[in-house]
Structures are given as C-alpha cells and as structure tokens.
Amino acid sequence: FGMVESLSYPFVGDDDYKAFGFDPEATKKVSVEIANPLYGDRPYLRREILPTLATTVQRNIRRGLENVSLYELGHVYLWDPDAPSIPALPGGVRPTDEQLAALDAGLPEQPDHVAGILTGLAEDDGWMGGKRPVDWSDAVEAVRRIAGRIGAAIVLDQPAADDVPVQWHPGRAARVMVGDVFTGWVGELHPRVNEALGFPAHSAAFELNLTALFATLTGKPVQAK
C-alpha cells in the first residue's frame, strides 16, 4: 500500500497530549509513569501509538520530505488506576506464587496495536491524471487491507459527532467494528490536530487494537515458515 514501517519510543508527555487535544491531567491519571524516564519531558508510557508515530512523521516533514505515510506495530500500556498496587519484594529471594500473581495483577494491560498516518499526496502526477491529496478514504483502504489480510470481517460505524474522540474529524471518522467488538478508529485527523503537528490539511490516520482484532477470528491465522 506504499506505507513504510517505523519504530518510535513509547514515551509521551504534555506536548503530545495537547497536540492531540487530550486533557493532560486526566490522561496522566490513567497512564503509566516511568520512574527514570529517558526524556524528562516524556515521562509516561503511551496509551495509543498515534502520538509517538506522529513525532516520527513530524521529523520527516521538517527535514523536507513530502508525502510521508508511516505505520507502526507495537504495544500500548493501559493503566487501570483501580488495579492493586505492585508489591515491593526483597532481592535475592525467589517470589512465591502468590507474590508473582500479585505482580501480574498490578501490571497494565499491554495489547498489540497497529497505527498509521498518511500525509501529502496519495497520487502524484502521472500519465493517467493529476495529483490527488491524501484523504480519509486512503486510511480506510489501509484498514480494509489489514483486515482482509488476517481474515477479519470489519464494519465501519460512523458515530454522532459528539461521540467522536477529540483527535478525529467529527464528520470523517469511524469506529472499526467486528460484530459488537470495537477494534479501533480510522479517518481524518481533526484540523486542529493537523495544524498543531504541522501536517498537511486532511492528513488521515488509523489505529487498530490487533489483540482485540485477532480475538474475533474463529480460526487460527496461517503463517508460512
């Protein structure tokens, strides 16, 4: 589909939250805080891939590249503030089964996600026609190809504008569903987000919860060896 895979550090901070329209204080309450962060201004683990992938797209655009379309596969970290506290254990002693269970219970959920951002031109000048900028339909096509490749029967559900998360254009975004199972979002980024990130107008994106998507499959995925 012409997208390039990228890897980004899974760290976020206030600037990332604000660019995507998130309330920083509310988001911090459900985010994993790093005790010794690599970057002082990004002391939290991401809850979505898009904010960290956006940083990579920004870097490419600032270096003069155009028509940047990247995707990333990776973990997100969904902290539950009501989860039990992780116990402090002494060193040099193997934890008991009960202590190991307590450690597991306190860990955040870490599903696999895939996210993509498409900017610039979807089609450049060619013998069949002129230039065409990226729009939401290109992100939808990417999602359909992912679903088709793994055999998931997705349906796009466009909610009322008030039910669309702040990072998405309220009239050009949809939930990605498999039956009654929510697996992600696809569409055009909100104009305010594109402006804050320095992206071209109408830049589009998607983010899918692959763990949830694979759980909807009735058979096991086939992998060639």
Where do the protein language model's features map onto the residues?
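Extended beta-strand-rich architecture
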Residues: F1-K225
